[in-house]
């Protein structure tokens, strides 16, 4: 059974943890976060179905003072896991990679990280074979993932030499007020990171 850890228990991390916990061939060792955010508080209110590890030991008191039990540190989670799913904010995954390397733990990074964090810039539909056997994968962003599925399917059928598109998306997920207007639309500068991806 593959032992999996999740770093970052936000919008993406919650989905990853729930997905891993539902698999018959995986064991969720735990999730790591830094503060008693809304998802972490909800985890506690659900009776802690997943072990919570502090990503910043020096700030463990933020969690314990809020009455949230802590099972250990991010490094202890990494030591126990075979693979880490890193859903932390952009740039944090690259810092976490140092811990993953130290413990020879494989990792999959979310789309906000820079491409050089991983061996393969990975999309399960378009280049699955390149990811097989790699130790570190970086996933495309959620918007890019959807675009790649559609464009790749058409490309395989009839060929797509070039695409031009406009992406209209919300600025931030509910609860992520620090990223900007929640549930609002914003026109991005061109090219966006989706174009580069």
Language model features with spans:
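Catalytic core of tubulin tyrosine ligase-like
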Residues: 160-197
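N-terminal Rossmann-like NAD(P) cofactor-binding subdomain of oxidoreductases
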Residues: 1-171
């Amino acid at each position: 059974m593959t032992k999996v850890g999740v770093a970052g228990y936000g919008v993406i991390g919650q989905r990853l943890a729930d997905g891993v916990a539902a698999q018959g061939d995986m064991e969720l060792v735990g999730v790591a976060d830094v503060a008693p955010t809304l998802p972490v508080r909800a985890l506690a209110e659900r009776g802690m179905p997943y072990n919570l590890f502090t990503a910043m030991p020096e700030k463990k008191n933020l969690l314990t003072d809020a009455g949230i039990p802590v099972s250990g540190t991010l490094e202890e989670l990494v030591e126990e896991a075979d693979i880490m799913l890193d859903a932390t904010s952009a740039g944090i995954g690259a810092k976490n990679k140092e811990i993953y390397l130290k413990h020879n733990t494989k990792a999959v990074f979310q789309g906000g990280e820079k491409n050089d964090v991983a061996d393969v810039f990975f999309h399960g539909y378009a280049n699955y074979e390149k990811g097989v056997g790699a130790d570190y994968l970086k996933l495309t962003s959620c918007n890019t993932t959807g675009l790649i599925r559609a464009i790749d399917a058409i490309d395989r059928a009839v060929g797509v030499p070039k695409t031009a598109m406009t992406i209209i998306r919300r600025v931030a997920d509910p609860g992520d007020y620090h990223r900007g207007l929640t549930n609002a639309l914003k026109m991005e500068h061109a090219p966006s990171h989706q174009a580069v991806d």
